[in-house]
Amino acid sequence: MNPPKAILTDIEGTTTPIAFVHRVLFPYAKANMAGFLAAYSDDEAVAAILAEVEAQYPGRPALETLLGWMDEDAKITPLKALQGLIWREGYRNGALQAQVHPDAAQSLRAWHEAGLNLFVYSSGSVEAQQLLFSYSDQGDLSLLFGGFFDTRIGGKREADSYRHIIANTGMQPQSMLFLSDIEEELDAALDAGLRTCQLVRAGDNGGPPTLRHPHAPDFIAVAHLFGLPHP
């Protein structure tokens, strides 16, 4: 089989350590949420998010709902959008710097230089994805990607979401390789016709290797498995 022409990558547990998301990003958003909402309550984007939250739970304080969703690690679009706005402020004022595995950064650069089309699909908002790759400890990686997708296109465990991504990118399903650490996401992508590879990174507390999908410990191994350029 020919090497993939496009890569669709997850972030958490794939390009970026799970610990960075759960021990740095989430606590930062939670600690700063009340102050951010108070400071930016008149901002149009913030007001729209709050209206969406309040429409789901009328009469309940939006902050209470948002913090509850955070405690549940809910993949809900208005929460993810607000987190993205809070993180934007943190990245821009120097309080945050994203962590990206060196092997991921090196491979993504090599694949981009070789002409592969690179895309991101994460439960975090598109803005949060762009910020993470812009303010990474491996330099600005954001311009390597031709597109970013979040839960507005659908849930990551639903095959139709990957079909929508294929339609949006104009790629053929079998020409796109999806990289993730989560078996259910890989199952959905495979059901939509994409090629798949599970990242099983040592010490990252991701899922165990699956039987249905090829797996690799890092992006260098992915490159060898699928005949892709490697650093």
UniProtKB/Swiss-Prot annotation:
SUPFAM superfamilies, alphabetized: HAD-like
The cofactor required is: Mg(2+)
Keyword annotations from UniProtKB, A to Z: Amino-acid biosynthesis, Hydrolase, Magnesium, Metal-binding, Methionine biosynthesis
Q: Name one Pfam family in it.
A: Hydrolase
What detail does the entry give on cofactor binding?
Answer: Binds 1 Mg(2+) ion per subunit.
Q: Which InterPro entries does this entry report, sorted A to Z?
A: Enolase-ppase_E1 (IPR023943), HAD-like_sf (IPR036412), HAD-SF_hydro_IA (IPR006439), HAD_sf (IPR023214)
User: Keyword Ion transport on this protein?
Assistant: no
Catalytic activity reads: 5-methylsulfanyl-2,3-dioxopentyl phosphate + H2O = 1,2-dihydroxy-5-(methylsulfanyl)pent-1-en-3-one + phosphate
Q: Select a single GO molecular function from the record's annotations and give it.
A: magnesium ion binding
EC number from the UniProt entry: 3.1.3.77
**Keyword Protease on entry:** no
What pathway does this protein act in?
Amino-acid biosynthesis; L-methionine biosynthesis via salvage pathway; L-methionine from S-methyl-5-thio-alpha-D-ribose 1-phosphate: step 3/6; Amino-acid biosynthesis; L-methionine biosynthesis via salvage pathway; L-methionine from S-methyl-5-thio-alpha-D-ribose 1-phosphate: step 4/6
Q: Please give the Gene3D superfamilies that the UniProt record associates with this protein.
A: 1.10.720.60, HAD superfamily/HAD-like
Coiled-coil annotation reads none
Question: GO biological process: any one?
Answer: L-methionine salvage from methylthioadenosine
Q: What is stated as this protein's family in its record?
A: Belongs to the HAD-like hydrolase superfamily. MasA/MtnC family.
PANTHER family attached to this UniProt entry: ENOLASE-PHOSPHATASE E1 (PTHR20371:SF1)
Quaternary structure note: Monomer.
- Please give the function described in this protein's UniProt entry: Bifunctional enzyme that catalyzes the enolization of 2,3-diketo-5-methylthiopentyl-1-phosphate (DK-MTP-1-P) into the intermediate 2-hydroxy-3-keto-5-methylthiopentenyl-1-phosphate (HK-MTPenyl-1-P), which is then dephosphorylated to form the acireductone 1,2-dihydroxy-3-keto-5-methylthiopentene (DHK-MTPene).
Q: What is this protein called?
A: Enolase-phosphatase E1
Give the lineage: Bacteria, Pseudomonadati, Pseudomonadota, Alphaproteobacteria, Acetobacterales
Gene that encodes it: mtnC
